Design a protein with these regions (language model features):
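Catalytic alpha/beta core domains of metabolic enzymes, predominantly
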Residues: 1-119
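Terminal or standalone catalytic/regulatory effector modules within metabolic enzymes
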Residues: 119-147
Length: 147
């Protein structure tokens, strides 16, 4: 329809709704998959999302980790832009490419790698567990990091 109306792909932003992992865990994977498909649907288009929606309803201390890991996952899936809380410095660092090791760890888990959890720092273990959670490989509970 866009082409019929003379609207070029590069003028279009896709903005799928990001639903909370706390209540719509399966929809988190749906948004990730949609981001992967945008490039096939309209190669020159752009994508955007309200990133922090993914952590709505989670305890405040866990929201930054959920947001940061989901950003890494969506970046891998082709995300072009995101509405984020600029006060979350680690999230901003991730977006600007200053958390490269964490980004690579998320991507390796997305690729199916099973890291040696005993050899990882606690922060890296939390990233692995959160990636698996957002991929739907474990069920959400406020205590997912303790399992």
């Amino acid at each position: 329809k866009m082409a019929e109306q003379g609207i070029e792909d590069e003028r279009v932003f896709y903005d799928p709704i990001v639903l909370p992992v706390t209540s719509q865990q399966d929809q988190v994977q749906g948004c990730t998959l949609f981001m992967q498909m945008v490039g096939d649907l309209a190669p020159e288009s752009k994508s955007n999302c309200g990133l922090s929606n993914v952590s709505n309803g989670a305890p405040e201390e866990l929201r930054p980790l959920l947001n940061r890991v989901y950003l890494a996952m969506l970046m891998r899936s082709g995300l072009g832009a995101a509405i984020v809380n600029h006060a979350e410095t680690e999230l901003v660092d991730m977006a600007r490419g200053r958390r490269d090791e964490e980004l690579k760890l998320v991507h390796r888990v997305m690729d199916g790698e099973e890291p040696d959890m005993g050899a990882l720092s606690q922060e890296a273990v939390d990233v692995v567990k959160t990636t698996r959670l957002l991929m739907g490989q474990s069920l959400y509970s406020h205590s997912w990091l303790k399992l």
